[in-house]
Amino acid sequence: KTPDGNAFLRQIKGMAPGDELLVQVTGYGEDGKAIPVQHRVLFKSRFVIVTPNAPGINVSRSIRDDDRREELLAVVHDTVENVPHGIILRSSCEVAEDADIADDLLSMLSLADQVLSDDGSGPEMLTEGDSPHLLAWRDWVEPAEVVTEDGGFETHGVMDAVEALESPR
C-alpha cells in the first residue's frame, strides 16, 4: 500500500504480506490497477544515477574517449572521499562541465542519504517524482533542431508522420 493506493511489486520472493519495504514508483497505475513499484531504488539526475546497494563507479559505455572516462572517474573521487553508493556517470557527462557533474553528484548523494535514512513506518512519500519538464531536461540532452524556414514541415516529413498516426496500425 502507498499513500496513493495499492502498489504492485514484482520479485516478492521471501516477503510476507504486511512487510514494510522502501519502494520506488516506476510508472502510473491504470484505472482500477495498482501502481507499479520496484524495491531497487535509483536516484536519477542529468549527469549521474545513484544506485544504493549496488556499489561501484561506472561510466556510460557510450563515452568511448578513454581520457574523458578517466577525467570523469577523477571528478567522482575528487568530489566524494568514500562513495557510499553505486554511481553511474551518464552519457551526458561526456560534454558537461566537471563542476556541474560534481554538483549534481553531491545533490543526488544527499537525496539518496535523506531517503534511505528515513526510519518512519507506514506508507509515506519520501520525495516527489520529477516533473515532466525535469524528466525531459534530464533525459534529452542532445540539442534540438529548430526549423523556422517556410516548407519546414515538408522538408522534415512532419505531414507524413501525422498521416501515419491517423491510420490504424
Predicted regions and their residues:
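DE-rich acidic low-complexity regions and acidic surface loops
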Residues: 1-169
